[in-house]
From Swiss-Prot:
Record-annotated Glutamine amidotransferase type-1 domain positions: 2-226
Gene that this sequence comes from: purQ
Protein name: Phosphoribosylformylglycinamidine synthase subunit PurQ
UniProt EC number: 6.3.5.3, 3.5.1.2
Keyword Ligase included in the entry's annotation: yes
The keyword Oxidoreductase appears for this protein: no
Pathway(s) this gene product operates in, as recorded in its UniProt entry: Purine metabolism; IMP biosynthesis via de novo pathway; 5-amino-1-(5-phospho-D-ribosyl)imidazole from N(2)-formyl-N(1)-(5-phospho-D-ribosyl)glycinamide: step 1/2
Matches recorded under HAMAP family: PurQ
Species this chain originates from: Listeria monocytogenes serotype 4a (strain HCC23)
UniProt keyword terms in alphabetical order: ATP-binding, Cytoplasm, Glutamine amidotransferase, Hydrolase, Ligase, Nucleotide-binding, Purine biosynthesis
Length: 227
């Protein structure tokens, strides 16, 4: 399986993503610069964390207009897996692949720590190797991670089982309904503020993020068999 790691000016978690795919799960991964216009040959897209375009105007607002974005939209429409982490999640909301928005943390400070997450939906292509309700430990590092949506959108997310991860015990940023990660209605686009790519080795704090990437590979291989 081959992953595309999209690089924007200001990305800083792209190397972590590449390491997680190549070294931790042994799959192929390549950088794709934001000015490219093709994702031919790739099976999954990863939008990494960081500060794309310096977070000017608004987080993800300028990245929305990158040349690669129409191809990311087309990729998602084909049902292929797209994962946006932290700034990547912010970009996914900006381009309309996911509902809602990420706003300033309610304490107005940058937060960098490991937090407990509850797996709220273990039936997606990103979470099938987790147990429903399982508590995992994954780092967060953001200043605008406070997920917001209106009441109608929140109700729809709940009814469609689109809330994949929630903060457990402590909500670090004020997100509505403790939301840490959501999928689109089709289930092939996941946006999350915590960084699973930083939780793939015991030596740096744990491996609870590893199964997310392994789940994607498992789902992809099953699809190839059934194709």
């Amino acid at each position: 399986m081959k992953f595309a790691v999209i690089q924007f000016p200001g990305s800083n978690c792209d190397l972590d993503m590449l390491h997680a795919i190549r070294d931790s799960i042994g799959e192929e991964a390549e950088y794709v610069w934001h000015a490219e216009t093709s994702l031919a040959g790739f099976d999954a897209v990863l939008l990494p964390g960081g500060f794309s375009y310096g977070d000017y105007l608004r987080t993800g607002a300028i990245a929305k207009f990158s040349s690669i974005m129409p191809e990311v939209l087309r990729f998602a429409e084909m049902g292929k897996p797209v994962l946006g982490v932290c700034n990547g999640f912010q970009i996914l909301t900006e381009i309309g692949l996911l509902p809602g928005a990420l706003i300033r943390n309610n304490n107005l400070h940058f937060i960098c720590k490991t937090v407990p997450l509850r797996v709220a939906n273990a039936s997606t292509m990103f979470t099938e190797l987790y147990e429903e309700g399982e508590i995992i430990q994954v780092p967060v590092a953001h200043g605008e991670g406070n997920y917001y949506c209106d009441d109608e959108t929140l109700l729809k997310l709940k009814e469609n089982n689109q809330i994949v991860f929630t903060y457990d015990s402590v909500n670090p940023n004020g997100s509505r309904a403790d939301i840490a990660g959501i999928v689109n209605e089709r289930g092939n686009v996941l946006g999350m503020m915590p960084h699973p790519e930083r939780a793939v080795e015991e030596i740096i704090g744990g491996t609870d993020g590893l199964r997310l990437f392994e789940s994607v590979v498992k789902a992809w291989k099953e699809e190839q068999v059934n194709a």
